[in-house]
């Protein structure tokens, strides 16, 4: 599979778009359906069409049916007919995490992001945010060295 490596410095995704993406992920964070009040997760995706779709995690009592924020954001975009994802912002509010620590997508979400990128041919930019208002940008290929299936 060949993914299109977008030059993100070439203003394919502008700074205001990145800021809006992170803001959207953080804005919906308060709406998460959590079992406990000590952890909240959300995400927002930016599509090739320029639209932003945000979503929160939806925790199930059994945990096996839990939908993660990243999964829900991808589904939200797909429900609107948009599967070409340029970037995803991940936000979290977790009391047991150190101040300033970034939350990475779990491996299930990384797999789903990989499959989304594989279908569209676009390598997704992942924007991690922390509770200090800082962000860290990582291309999907830098986060996952050996995706499956190749």
Predicted features along the sequence, with ranges:
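Short beta-strand scaffold segments in enzyme catalytic cores
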Residues: 40-47
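A short glycine/serine-rich beta->alpha loop
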Residues: 55-63, 95-99
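Short loop/turn motifs at secondary-structure junctions and domain boundaries
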Residues: 34-37
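A short mixed-secondary-structure module that forms the rim of ligand-binding clefts
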Residues: 60-79
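Hydrophobic "anchor" residues
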Residues: 51-52, 135
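C-terminal binding/interaction regions
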Residues: 13-31, 83-150
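Short, positively charged and aromatic/hydrophobic N-terminal segments
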Residues: 2-8
